Amino acid sequence: DWSSDVCSSDLIAFGMMANLMNIATNTQACLVEKMYGRNIMSSFHGLWSLGGFSGGIIGAIFANTLLPIDVHFGTILALSILIIAVGFRFLINDAMAKAEEEDVPKFSFKTIDPILFLLGLMGFAGMFCEGTVYDWSSVYFSSVVKPDEAFIRAGYVAGMGAMTLGRFMADGFVTKYGPARVLKVCGGLILGGLWLAAALPYLIPATLGFLLVGFGISSSVPICYSIAGKLGTIKASIAITIVSSISFFGFLVGPPVIGWLAEATGLRIAISIAACLGLMIAFVAAKVGKRLS
């Protein structure tokens, strides 16, 4: 009926606007990082993770109060407008952005830097595994690990908590060890974490496995965005558009692909296969390490 059509249209528009805001926000973050003179991109993504936690808590509060959904949505809309209105005046304006990128060559598909596609590939792998934790960790615990009801979401909480903490820690590691080394460690943590959870489907090792995955996925995407924005061969906004578009495709296809693999082979084998994406991150980072520094 018309209400479902309107809702579908609204969700499509919401998704498009959310992605545009993602690109704009990360472009601003790259420009701030350049001006700041040190690695801070992962901390920005850490605040995004805190926003997700806050949204979940607020949603749970509204659900428990049984208030109408229009009150819920209206309150969030008003809060969002307030935050945007306050933050807007602190944004880097177009003139400042152009000054920062005045020496950047004009964009051309013929001269596009191949490293952007490799960064996108690593971002794709990271977001594929992030989507797996979001959508399948609780299913894995309920159907494979089978702990007490109170611990069904242990893997999800461990993974998301580690991802948030890891993002606030990552900038210091990138500064000290370089982005290539950190990406290789991230890939190893994803690989080892998912294999641990698949090999030992018991409460403690499976929870530890998803904890390691959370630390692994925490920094992979922010580092890729940061490198893309600082390449100097292309405008930061265009670089992040390319990398984020490839990356978010992993978030889109990851959960259904895991579902298809789980139906065909079982969930333990499915997440074991997904773990190989961590190996891919480490391999690509090792191959192009000099370009990432």
Regions flagged by a language model, labelled:
Residues 70-89, 269-287:
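Symmetry-related core transmembrane helices of the 12-TM Major Facilitator Superfamily/SLC fold
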